[in-house]
């Protein structure tokens, strides 16, 4: 194997701004790009507030979300930053994971303190597995009383602790996004301080290739004289020829086999890794032993399950979703990775029904096992049409 070439590139981290409406998320996003552009002109372009605020609409799994993507660099890192103009866009983005976050900047206005959407975003961040939070206490220039600033900071820390973030330990940085954007030197420095806190407190994510091997099966073929080949895109990890793998999901029994060949673009490889579309030749496996929807994994790294809890967003009628609400015992299909499995929905106590456009927690019982872990995303479908999207928050069985 040729040695991997050494690339002088910075670590890449995905972050986003979350928090209550009008607390200054978009202004802060613009201020970060401006301040970093001023500090490191050759590394950064400044993005104006209007550019970010007029976020283009994206469609992810049939769901329309407005997301602004900006990128910038500190001395040590390269960041991709997402900001959503509307509250509904945040909810949709966080649940569908359209833009996955390695960490978030929670923006809280010092003039208001934590508000209902602050709570909702923190709860969602906890449920969908945003692992780290740094707080920007914004509009700090508008509060003269030190005691009030300290009280608001305490409130934010308590809120974060309530949702199992390390509220006492994580950084809370006082900033004024607007003043920084207007070129005020002192408040410009506050935004640099914030980014230093982000650099130091949001760890680099584990790269997909370093995780245990997993590939969802998309297709199965028989090649005469050679055996059974399954194709798919490697989701994570690295697989070498002659390694042992488990095939799990859909069926009750797992199958263990050896991969005797790995092909990509009709060429034989020594190994396949995350992101590559490959064909795997499996020893002693018949065509009917495996099917689309199963996954091939490093033995023992994932287990199949039928019962889980999830946070889901249900498409509105305008997004092509349902026109009517659904109730307890709703039975749609849950599309995991490459296949649909029917499941029965139990709504949280006190929730009679779920309207199109709502987000909700739910318990689901599938009729066939699916290889799953917390954080796994799925679409909710009715006869092939997407009516919702969600993420596994807890596995029950």
UniProtKB/Swiss-Prot annotation:
The modification Phosphothreonine is found at residue 386. Residues 10-206 form the tr-type G domain. One of its GO terms (molecular function) is translation elongation factor activity. Its main location: cytoplasm. NCBIfam families: EF-Tu (TIGR00485), PRK00049.1 (NF000766), PRK12735.1 (NF009372), PRK12736.1 (NF009373), small_GTP (TIGR00231). Mg(2+) binds at residue 26. It catalyses: GTP + H2O = GDP + phosphate + H(+). Residues 19-26 are annotated as: G1. This is Elongation factor Tu-1. It is an enzyme of class 3 (hydrolase). Residues 83-86 are annotated as: G3. Keywords: Cytoplasm, Elongation factor, GTP-binding, Hydrolase, Magnesium, Metal-binding, Nucleotide-binding, Phosphoprotein, Protein biosynthesis. Belongs to the TRAFAC class translation factor GTPase superfamily. Classic translation factor GTPase family. EF-Tu/EF-1A subfamily. Residues 138-141 are annotated as: G4. Residues 62-66 are annotated as: G2. GTP binds at residues 19-26, 83-87, 138-141. The gene is tuf1. One of its GO terms (cellular component) is cytosol. SUPFAM superfamilies: EF-Tu/eEF-1alpha/eIF2-gamma C-terminal domain, P-loop containing nucleoside triphosphate hydrolases, Translation proteins. InterPro entries: EF-Tu_GTP-bd (IPR041709), EF-Tu_GTPase (IPR050055), EFTu-like_2 (IPR004161), EFTU_2 (IPR033720), G_TR_CS (IPR031157), P-loop_NTPase (IPR027417), Small_GTP-bd (IPR005225), T_Tr_GTP-bd_dom (IPR000795). Residues 176-178 are annotated as: G5. GTP hydrolase that promotes the GTP-dependent binding of aminoacyl-tRNA to the A-site of ribosomes during protein biosynthesis.
């Amino acid at each position: 194997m040729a040695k991997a070439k050494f690339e002088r590139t910075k670590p890449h981290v995905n972050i986003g701004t979350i928090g209550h409406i009008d607390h200054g998320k978009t202004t802060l996003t613009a201020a970060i790009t401006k301040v970093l552009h001023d500090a490191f002109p050759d590394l950064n372009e400044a993005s104006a507030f209007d550019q970010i605020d007029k976020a283009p609409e994206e469609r992810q799994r049939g769901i329309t979300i407005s997301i602004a993507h900006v990128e910038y660099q500190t001395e040590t890192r390269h960041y991709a930053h997402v900001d959503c103009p509307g509250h509904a866009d945040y909810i949709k983005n966080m649940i569908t994971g359209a833009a996955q976050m390695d960490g978030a900047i929670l923006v809280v206005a010092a003039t208001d303190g934590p508000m209902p959407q602050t709570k909702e975003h923190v709860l969602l961040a906890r449920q969908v597995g945003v692992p780290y939070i740094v707080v920007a206490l914004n509009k700090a220039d508008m509060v003269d009383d030190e005691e009030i600033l300290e009280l608001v900071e305490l409130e934010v820390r308590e809120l974060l602790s309530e949702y199992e973030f390390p509220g006492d330990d994580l950084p809370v940085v006082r900033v004024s996004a607007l003043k920084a954007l207007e070129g005020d030197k002192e408040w410009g420095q506050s935004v640099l301080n914030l980014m230093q806190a982000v650099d130091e407190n949001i760890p680099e994510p584990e790269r997909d290739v370093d995780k245990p091997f997993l590939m969802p099966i998309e297709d199965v073929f028989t090649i005469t004289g050679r055996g059974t080949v399954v194709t798919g895109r490697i989701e994570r990890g690295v697989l070498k020829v002659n390694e042992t793998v488990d095939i799990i999901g859909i069926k009750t029994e797992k199958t263990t086999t050896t991969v005797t060949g790995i092909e990509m673009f009709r060429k034989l490889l020594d190994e396949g890794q995350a992101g590559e579309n490959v064909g795997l030749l499996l020893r002693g496996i018949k065509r009917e032993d495996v099917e689309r929807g199963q996954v091939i994994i490093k033995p023992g790294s994932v287990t199949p399950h039928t019962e889980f809890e999830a946070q889901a967003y249900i498409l509105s009628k305008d997004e092509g979703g349902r026109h009517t609400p659904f109730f307890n015992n709703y039975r749609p299909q849950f599309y995991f990775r490459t296949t649909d499995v029917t499941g029965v929905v139990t709504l949280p106590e006190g929730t009679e029904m779920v309207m199109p456009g709502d987000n909700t927690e739910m318990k689901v019982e599938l009729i066939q096992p699916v290889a799953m872990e917390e954080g796994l995303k799925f679409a909710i479908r009715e006869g092939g049409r997407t009516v919702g999207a969600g993420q596994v928050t807890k596995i029950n069985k």
